[in-house]
């Protein structure tokens, strides 16, 4: 028999669930919209309680402040077990009373660190793979479809490098966009984008494609290695890739 605690995907709700479930030896935390629950299993829809969440976060901060950062990363992942992985990791941390990330012999710690690393790897990749296009209005637009919810993790990086530009990073899969203008940025819901590239953008794209294919040495192509360094899911957003 298991008791399922359904969260709404927010940090505060997750930490409330940790508080509610901690003394439950059969707890399973999840934000999945559909769960397969067996006969006799319990089901609880978690209601956010800021006081409970704050108590849990204060406890964690006192043991290992970096763990709060790790939990934030884990909960951004596109992994069906992310809440449970984060919860079990926190149990190890609280029960040991000291940082647990180095205890990779523990499967709960290892799974949590794997998910955390996957999110970090995608952020790192997108800093290099993201392609901005200049619209006719002069705004730079970069569509993407990351595995994980990382748009707001990308915004500070590009805001620091494109200070004088207005730009949009659009997660077309989740329907959210990071918008930067005059030193400030926010992340908001966004539908399908419709825009016209500027004349300069069309010229640059044409030149870049010609350059990319001109410098390619056919005899040295290694598609397997290419896929390892540049996952196929990013290709459709790259200027140099044919449509």
Regions found by a protein language model. Give the residues of each.
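N-terminal ordered "arm"
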Residues: 1-50
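Short, hydrophobic/amphipathic alpha-helical patches that form generic packing surfaces
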Residues: 13-24, 87-95, 153-160, 206-213
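Acidic, Ser/Thr-rich peripheral helices and adjacent loops at domain boundaries
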Residues: 44-51, 185-197
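Internal, well-folded beta-alpha domain core
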Residues: 99-189
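Long, compositionally biased intrinsically disordered terminal regions
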Residues: 166, 177-178, 182, 196-243
């Amino acid at each position: 028999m298991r008791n399922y605690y359904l969260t709404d995907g927010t940090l505060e709700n997750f930490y409330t669930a940790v508080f509610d479930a901690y003394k439950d030896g059969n707890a399973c935390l999840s934000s999945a919209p559909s769960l397969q629950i067996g006969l006799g299993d319990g089901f609880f829809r978690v209601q956010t309680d800021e006081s409970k969440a704050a108590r849990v976060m204060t406890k964690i901060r006192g043991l290992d402040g970096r763990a709060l950062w790790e939990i934030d990363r884990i909960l951004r992942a596109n992994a069906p077990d992310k809440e449970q992985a984060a919860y079990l990791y926190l149990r190890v941390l609280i029960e040991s009373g000291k940082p647990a990330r180095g205890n990779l012999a523990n499967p709960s710690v290892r799974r949590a660190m794997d998910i955390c690393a996957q999110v970090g790897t995608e952020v790192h990749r997108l800093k290099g793979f993201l392609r901005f296009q200049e619209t006719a209005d002069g705004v730079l637009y970069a569509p993407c479809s990351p595995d994980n919810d990382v748009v707001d993790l990308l915004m500070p990086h590009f805001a620091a490098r494109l200070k004088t530009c207005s730009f949009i990073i659009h997660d077309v899969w989740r329907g959210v966009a990071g918008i930067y203008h005059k030193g400030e940025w926010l992340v908001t819901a966004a539908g399908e984008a419709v825009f016209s590239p500027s004349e300069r953008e069309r010229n640059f794209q044409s030149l870049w494609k010609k350059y990319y294919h001109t410098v390619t040495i056919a005899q040295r192509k290694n598609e397997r290695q290419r896929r390892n360094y540049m996952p196929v899911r990013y290709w459709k957003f790259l200027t140099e890739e044919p449509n």
